[in-house]
Curated annotation (Swiss-Prot):
This is Fibrillarin-like rRNA/tRNA 2'-O-methyltransferase. NCBIfam families: PRK04266.1-1, PRK04266.1-2, PRK04266.1-3. Its EC number is 2.1.1.-. GO terms for biological process: box C/D sno(s)RNA 3'-end processing; tRNA processing. Pfam families: Fibrillarin (PF01269). The lineage of its organism: Archaea, Thermoproteota, Thermoprotei, Thermoproteales, Thermoproteaceae. Interacts with nop5. Component of box C/D small ribonucleoprotein (sRNP) particles that contain rpl7ae, FlpA and nop5, plus a guide RNA. Belongs to the methyltransferase superfamily. Fibrillarin family.
Amino acid sequence: MSIEVVDVRKHEHHFGVYVVKFEDGTERLATKNLTPGKRVYGERLIKWRDEEYREWNPYRSKLAAAIVNGIKFIPIQEGTHMLYLGAASGTTPSHISDIVGERGLIYSVEFSPRVFREFIEKLVDQGRRNVVPILGDARFPYQYAHYVKGVDVVYIDVAQPAQAKILADNADYFLKPGGYVMLVIKAMSIDVTAPATETFKQEINTLKERGFEILETVHLEPYDTAHAMVIAKKK
């Protein structure tokens, strides 16, 4: 038997993010479904007052984990244009798609052809017209420069060394003046021998050296071990 929803409220800090309260007292994040009736990764669909919401699982999405862990500022609004590096099969991009709405746009770069096909099946083929799938390697932004116009945000979530460098290189190509970057640091993908905190510092210093002001850093435990989310702005 499903647990009844007793309330849905707007998140106090983040546009387009909602908090769903259930009758047992538990609360879950959600976004308003841009394509009602359709799921992306098996998430629960929640009906409330003639609207449909998609539960946003912090164990499946590092952005959701950052929100649950108290990040105060995320530079994503209705109409935001974003370059998303490491789109994978589309879990987090799908929720960003809900948030930015029909006026927004998410250029979604994925390296693996198999995963790329899955992304298209789950998002584009299901009617998410604000998502532009790009099969490419985030290390080489010139390869897809003819597809991407200036963006408000560059987001990266890749299992590569030099994650901050890859992000900054893409920002040099595509980020509008005064734009923001969102860096998911995967410490074990950079150096399995160093403490995660040292790897975080190293990547943050790379962003600073490339002209970014660090606005906020949040660790993602217990949802993702040795991961952190960094929000920064181009000076």
